[in-house]
């Protein structure tokens, strides 16, 4: 009897462990779905809002990059939203491969992405220009190979200097200056003045 009771307790314990493991996996999947963009797999805006202060605290200096994909509306209108989605995914996958491991890529909204990087503005600008000029991201639309182009604005950040929303706004403004200057690239603070 005693052995049967022990075996039953062990079975109950094993079953409880399996249930807890499943529950932990379910919670982890939910957490991932809350932090990741479903289409691109990039971190999403909620994750940026949650992680950006910690990233900037852990990296005394670095860069915030605001990226806007060029021609996404045109691709959606002329070739369909499925191709527009593929355009976004292609960009995101290539950017993830081109970035440092410690850099974080976020899909901020629509065709807008943010990068938090421990690199100085000049370093990340070099990397972005290399992607645009020397090793562009190719995209196939119905057998036509096109380069994915984007405009960006970069601001430097230092620990405890400036609100995150202000940095995003400044990087966004620099990105629009970049677009209005026929895609001339704009870098660190003061470069646009």
Spans of features found by a protein language model:
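Alpha-helical scaffold within the catalytic cores of cyclic-nucleotide enzymes
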Residues: 92-93, 124-141, 172
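Signal-transducing coiled-coil linker helices
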Residues: 2-38, 46-57, 61-63, 107
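Conserved nucleotide-binding and Mg2+-coordinating catalytic segments in signaling enzymes
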Residues: 28-50, 67-81, 89
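Short helix/loop segment flanking the catalytic signature motif in cyclic-nucleotide metabolism enzymes
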Residues: 87, 114-131
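Catalytic-core segments of nucleotide cyclases and related cyclic-nucleotide turnover enzymes
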Residues: 77, 129, 142, 155-193
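Active-site-proximal alpha-helical element of nucleotidyl cyclase-like catalytic domains
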Residues: 83-102
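A short pre-motif secondary-structure segment
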Residues: 104-107, 146
């Amino acid at each position: 009897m005693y052995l049967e009771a022990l075996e039953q307790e062990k079975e109950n314990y094993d079953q409880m462990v399996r249930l807890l493991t499943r529950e932990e996996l379910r919670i982890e999947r939910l957490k991932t779905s809350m932090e990741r963009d479903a289409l691109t797999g990039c971190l999403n805006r909620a994750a940026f809002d949650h992680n950006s202060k910690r990233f900037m605290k852990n990296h005394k200096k670095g860069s915030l990059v605001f990226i806007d994909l060029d021609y996404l509306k045109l691709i959606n209108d002329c070739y369909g939203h499925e191709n527009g989605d593929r355009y976004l995914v292609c960009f995101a996958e290539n950017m993830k491969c081109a970035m440092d491991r410690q850099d974080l890529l976020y899909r901020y909204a629509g065709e807008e992405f943010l990068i938090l990087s421990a690199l100085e503005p000049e370093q990340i600008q070099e990397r972005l220009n290399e992607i645009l000029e020397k090793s562009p991201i190719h995209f196939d639309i119905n057998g036509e190979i096109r380069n994915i182009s984007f405009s960006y604005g970069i601001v430097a950040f230092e620990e405890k200097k400036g609100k995150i929303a202000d940095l995003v706004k400044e990087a966004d403004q620099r990105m629009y200056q970049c677009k209005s200057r026929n895609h001339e690239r704009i870098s660190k603070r003061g470069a646009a003045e």
